[in-house]
UniProtKB/Swiss-Prot annotation:
InterPro entries: DNA_mismatch_repair_CS, DNA_mismatch_repair_MutL, DNA_mismatch_S5_2-like, HATPase_C_sf, MutL/Mlh/PMS, MutL/Mlh/Pms-like, MutL_C, MutL_C_regsub. This protein is involved in the repair of mismatches in DNA. It is required for dam-dependent methyl-directed DNA mismatch repair. May act as a 'molecular matchmaker', a protein that promotes the formation of a stable complex between two or more DNA-binding proteins in an ATP-dependent manner without itself being part of a final effector complex. This is DNA mismatch repair protein MutL. It comes from Shewanella oneidensis (strain ATCC 700550 / JCM 31522 / CIP 106686 / LMG 19005 / NCIMB 14063 / MR-1). Residues 337-362, 400-429 are annotated as: Disordered.
Amino acid sequence: MGIQILPPQLANQIAAGEVVERPASVVKELVENSLDAGASRIDIEIDKGGSKLIKIRDNGSGIPKEELALALSRHATSKLHSLDDLEAILSFGFRGEALASISSVSRLTLTSRTAEQSEAWQAYAEGVEMAVKVMPAAHPVGSTIEVVDLFFNTPARRRFLKSDKTEFTHIDEWLKRIALVRGDIHFTLTHNGKTVRNYRPAMNEPQYLQRLTQVAGRPFADEALRVECQHDDLRLSGYLQSPWSTVLTDTHYFYVNGRLVRDRLVNHAVRQAFAQKAEVEQPGYVLMLDIDPHQVDVNVHPAKHEVRFHQSRYVHDYILQALQSALEEAGELRFEPHSPQIDDSSPYVKPETESSAFELQSTESNAKYLGIDTTGERQAEARVVEYRSSDMPKMRTGTAVQSNAFGSMSVPRETRSGSSGESRPRAELPSKTAIASYGALLQTPSYSVQDKAYQPTLPMPSILDGQFWVFTDGPKLSLLRIESVALATRSDEIETKLATGLIGQPLLMPVSVAADTDWSSLLDEHATLIRQLGLELTIRYQQLIIKKVPPYLRDCQLARVIPEWLQSLRFEAPAPNALAIWLAEQSLTGFISAPDVWVAYCQLTEEKRQQIASKAVSLPWQSWLEEQAIE
């Protein structure tokens, strides 16, 4: 048999073997064409699982009369015209094979009208040569494509179709995926005359969360963590399954420039990000990556299910770091009791009068110094925690990105209804009794460093640059760093309490980190010391579970601080003084109130005050005056 050109019908049927696998493949190709045409509403009508009828109607730009015949021809497309267009493609379709392939294995009718035309036109192909006939029709601006009797002329393919229910399930599942990434489009899905899905346009965050609930289910949507991250030409957005959730989900959707793809790269990045945090083996996610189209090749799979990144390692590390940062931010959002907020704009406050300098206030700044975290209002209200990046590495082929921050991301705490009055649940909500007991524990007065009625007999020195106290002793002028005084008074307080043991505060959400193999023996060996610090640590399934911590560690990154402390125990057990200094350093990470530090300083013994005062730095002001006089 000699070489010859295949007839159009045969060539199209061969191509249909790759493009048209089942009715869901037809729906995918036609809906993507509607999206490329700029449609804002797409109605999908299915009969008998798609084997009898597939009808797609949109309000897009339509097809001009003179191009209808070309639309049903092979390798005819309006999406690109040159190789440069292919290398920067953003549309769903670009090969020009879908309509020709579908029409070769079905009875296809295409009706369309543009805004410039006064009437619509209808086209269909028939015969061995697939000649296209065009005739007038009635139709609004947009297009309607009817695919009747799919695989009617290829009985073998038709026999391999599953039941109507199974085939429709594939169509429904694909529509769910496209509905997530195109929240601005109104989709309807009808099967056997009954409306099954109605995805209304999601023009704001609450509406999109409703769509996410429709598609992914309420267990995923209620606990999902939002991700927003951007750096240069890369932007990652979407939702992650909560690391505290134990619900199994099949929500694993990844989009590149709006195109749903299957990619091992992102699956690996998600698993790696959740490695030390998630209780489920494969967490759910809905992630959308926007990237420069020149940096990704979408023309590598017959059905366009896969893509190839030009710098895959860079993209992998970008996604990994973005997800890790989002999870770390989420881990810091802990429930805390309600208290009023104050403006902590200035690091230190100098009182206007001597008496007002020593009035202790129950504010957030004082609580920071006393080791009590009373910033509950920040957690009780829905909020967004932003994570900002600074210097970012440039793209380098084959080089892993070492930065731990790739942009800004947010983890909203709002409820699905849009209310900002209560926090979103992460797993099981605690009982009201537990919450009340927890809040009462955090406000236990025994954690105060001093009696609130105590009034110092010495006036507080003047403050220089918000960081130093200025002391005068005759002709001597010296500066004492307030932070060092706070550290000394706090460590003295902690060392005193260590003798009887610190009282641990239960975490509403225990923190879990991967455990080293010898940590179990470390916990047994130093069990007394751990209880003395008010810590409650257990190991389960190679995970270290942190259940209780002393008040001085509540503002710390527990997933980092506790493992580092356990590592130090491998060498030697620290002395009480060293433990007190370590706890004091961990607790003094935020705002420090100068009046409170002065109150604590005045309550120390004379000997300890002298030890602290010896750290003051003398200022050679006499020499400076002499130099000024000479000049």
